[in-house]
């Protein structure tokens, strides 16, 4: 064990311990141990794994702090792994000297506007456990190429940039679990310009990742932000499960945002499962653009400034057994699907609790320029002006739903409205309550067949 104090580090929070820590890496045994104390550094501690050999960094059960007072990451770990997760692709001295770099039980605090926490380049089987990174720019930055990353039981907190940043990286097999990722100005987990597969985000608390706590001007961001608009980007085979994902509403902000450019990459963002999360309090809670093959099920999604769920230019989206509602009077609820096809909405509850209709004036379920949409077995309650509002849609089926206004003073103008042009639409076997105007508005040009509905008189 290489105790950094035995190599000259003081840990007094004032002395520059940069060279002493480098001395411990250069001449130590690979287990970089920080006893209790505050270790001030002025430059990045860069570790070439091919030269140093297997590396561990330990902060003595969280009692050690590294204070980064210069620009760049406090620790930059550089490997040479150019293969995949396939054992046969691992070459050179990657297994003997580079595998499993582990950083645990240590705090990194930034004291420079461009200070980052940790940067990983071309590593294999990196492990982060019990790490606190705060007041930096970015917390953990993975770039270029990495494989088989584990991030667990970490606090990525109060950073001016991004909490966990997958930045122009080829990365397969990464688990982010049981972490607090909060109050990071430009997003909690953010993916840009990258090729990602097999990412699991599970059991985390991801909150308030926007400008508000930093007292800066608002910028579009999200708790989980995925941008594949850059050519060559693709993000597939992703699980977001059993997290709390919430925020304060901010302009163009989301809890989960997935962006693909119109007519973008050959491989759209897809093969995603978003399941069993608590998601709330943003302008749009979930906003999907250009996605192909996404399952959203079993989530409680609440309190939006615009929509609980906004889907644009997407296909094969399955929305099942979610609960949509507001949480505070000034916020709203609702689902909007635009220019999308092959979407199912099944077993969902959408409730507007505002006595006069939600502030946005939006209907509960809106469909615009869509085709092959199946809505079945849902409850759409207290929608104003409508429960379902469809424009320029074809081959839409709304069956077996309950669409009622349960308020003492009815506010719903219509239960279902189809306008514009379309064909092959079906409204059937629904339970439909009273409204203030025509219960069903089905323009002849919209091509709607209505049959077997039970209308409450």
Please report, for each region that a protein language model flagged, where it lies by residue.
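Extracellular beta-strand/beta-solenoid scaffold signature
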Residues: 42-47, 69-94, 111-120, 134-142, ...
